[in-house]
Structure formats: C-alpha cells, structure tokens
Design a protein with these regions (language model features):
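A ligand-binding cleft/hinge motif common to bilobed small-molecule-binding domains
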Residues: 15-26, 73-77, 98-132
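Acidic, polar ligand-binding/catalytic clefts
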Residues: 1-55, 123-131
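Periplasmic-binding protein-like
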Residues: 34-42, 109, 113-156
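Ligand-binding clefts/hinges and TM-proximal coupling segments of bilobed small-molecule sensing domains
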Residues: 70-85, 124, 155-172
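Short helix-initiation/N-cap motifs at beta->coil->alpha
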Residues: 1-3, 51, 85-99, 134
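Bilobed "Venus flytrap"/periplasmic-binding protein-like clamshell domains
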Residues: 17-18, 35, 39-90, 109-111, ...
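Hydrophobic residues within well-ordered alpha-helices
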Residues: 5-6, 56, 96-98, 138, ...
C-alpha cells in the first residue's frame, strides 16, 4: 500500500490503515477517523487452547504474519518465544491459518471480524483484551498538501455526520 502511494499508482488508500511513525516517514496520513487494535485469530477447534495472550508466547505455538506490516513488529516485540511463519505478499497470513499450517495469526479488529464471518472455522480471541490500540487514517502522498487538506475536510464532515461511528459499530 505504501509503495503504491509513493509510486503515484493511486491517490489514497482507504483501508483500515493503522498509523505508525515508520509509515508516516514515507506517506501522509489524514486526520484519524477511528481506532483499531490487534487480536489473535485461530481455528475454532483450537480456541480452547488459548486463554490469554501469554498462551501465544510459546515455542509450541506458530504465529503467522505478513512481512512489512505493523503485525510483524508486534509479534516480534510481544510474542518473542512463539514460532513464527513470515508470509510474503501477495499471499496472506490468514490463508496459512485457514489451511491449518499455523495456530494463530494476529489481525486487526475489523479484519478479524470479516474473516470470521467469511471463514466459519475461524474465531477471534480475547475480544476484551485487544492490544496495540492505534488510530486509523487514510494514506496519501506526503507532498500533496491540497489533496491532504481535501481528505481531512472530508474526514471531518463524515465524522460530524456520524458516518465513521456507524462503520465502527457495524464492524468493531
């Protein structure tokens, strides 16, 4: 996503992009429009195996993440004892989970909700203990202040109309 913005392949990334300092060095962010956090996702048959985040930090647990994502940084920092499977794009970490090649993947609240609806054998864990709460913003080019101003005004208008509140209520 970042490389597409910096290469001028597109003007805006409107996914649930978490704000990080490292990303902000390369791209611009709009004003925040919501928050997200990280939660583990596993197969339903394994849900009883994991009661807390600490249960994931175990050499007998394989955790998948996509290279170059904020999830990679999180897993390295918070789950250093876990066995990891690094997944390179265009493949996705959750595909490894669906296929049963890993025990867990770390996902955003939104993506975990969508994946659990789409793949009935997956279940999010620890919904009451979401980690790494961060603001969400849309990505734009750093050097286009006019476009950033437009996008910020759009975010403010949509926020005042309750649009993002309804999106967050629907998707978590």
């Amino acid at each position: 996503l970042i490389s597409g913005i910096t290469a001028n392949k597109y003007d805006v990334v409107m996914t649930g992009t978490s704000m990080t300092v490292s990303r902000a060095k390369a791209v611009g962010y709009t004003l925040p429009w919501g928050r997200t956090g990280y939660m583990p996702l596993t197969q339903k048959k394994n849900a009883g195996r994991f009661k807390t985040w600490e249960d994931l930090n175990d050499p007998n647990v394989t955790v998948a993440y996509n290279l170059g994502t904020s999830f990679e940084e999180f897993v390295k920092r918070e789950l250093p004892k876990a066995k990891v499977k690094r997944v390179e794009s265009p493949a996705r970490d959750w595909q490894e989970l669906v296929a049963g090649r890993v025990d867990v993947t770390i996902s955003s609240i939104l993506e975990a909700s969508v994946l659990a609806q789409k793949h009935k054998n997956l279940v999010p864990l620890f919904g009451d203990d979401v980690r790494n709460s961060v603001p969400l913003g849309f990505l734009v080019a750093q050097d286009d202040q006019v476009w950033l101003n437009f996008m910020n005004n759009w975010v403010m208008m949509k926020t005042s109309l309750g649009y993002f509140k309804s999106v967050n209520e629907k998707w978590g």
